[in-house]
Amino acid sequence: MAKLHDFYKETVVAELAKQFGYKSVMQVPRIEKITLNMGLGEAVADKKVLENAQADMTAIAGQKPVVTVARKSVAGFKIREGYPIGCKVTLRGERMWEFLERLISIAIPRVRDFRGLNPKSFDGRGNYSMGVREQIIFPEIDFDKVDKVRGMDITITTSANTNDEARALLDAFNFPFKK
């Protein structure tokens, strides 16, 4: 079992229950899933781009990504309905906890010119979204084999009802928010 999951069960649940005055431990917010999304507009012209992005995402997440397709045709972007334009992975359970551990302790500290995560990136319902500009911050990606530096969106979905509860949950995991 992931260390972060044990830490959550043993320490964070008790802290948050005390802080917010929950009557039951089942009311304490928990992380439900982490979604990684990589939008690849250039995949329309070159299919190899999508394959490379899928390989990178498989290495980062530890599971095969799903190819996302265009829902509508947009002439301005030269895409038609059904064209592959990205890939995404939804992590739950054990893989989610292991990824979160790697994200907090290894990947985020490797970001260049890092000044902290934006505390305003909560959506109002207790979910947090962040962008990563380069996939090479993850140790699983070999810098020499990368054809192009790509970014991705990381969304952390929690069971929290408010932003304050979600912020307290992520703070308990030592997320490096800006002060």
Curated annotation (Swiss-Prot):
GO biological process: translation
Keyword Methyltransferase: no
GO molecular function ontology, one term from the record: rRNA binding
Keyword rRNA-binding on entry: yes
Keywords from the named record: Ribonucleoprotein, Ribosomal protein, RNA-binding, rRNA-binding, tRNA-binding
Superkingdom assignment: Bacteria
Any one of the GO CC terms: ribonucleoprotein complex
InterPro entries: Ribosomal_uL5 (IPR002132), Ribosomal_uL5_bac-type (IPR020930), Ribosomal_uL5_C (IPR031309), Ribosomal_uL5_CS (IPR020929), Ribosomal_uL5_dom_sf (IPR022803), Ribosomal_uL5_N (IPR031310)
Quaternary organization: Part of the 50S ribosomal subunit; part of the 5S rRNA/L5/L18/L25 subcomplex. Contacts the 5S rRNA and the P site tRNA. Forms a bridge to the 30S subunit in the 70S ribosome.
Family listed: Belongs to the universal ribosomal protein uL5 family.
HAMAP family xrefs: Ribosomal_uL5_B
Function: This is one of the proteins that bind and probably mediate the attachment of the 5S RNA into the large ribosomal subunit, where it forms part of the central protuberance. In the 70S ribosome it contacts protein S13 of the 30S subunit (bridge B1b), connecting the 2 subunits; this bridge is implicated in subunit movement. Contacts the P site tRNA; the 5S rRNA and some of its associated proteins might help stabilize positioning of ribosome-bound tRNAs.
Protein name: Large ribosomal subunit protein uL5
Upper taxonomic lineage: Bacteria, Pseudomonadati, Pseudomonadota, Gammaproteobacteria, Alteromonadales
Chain's gene name: rplE
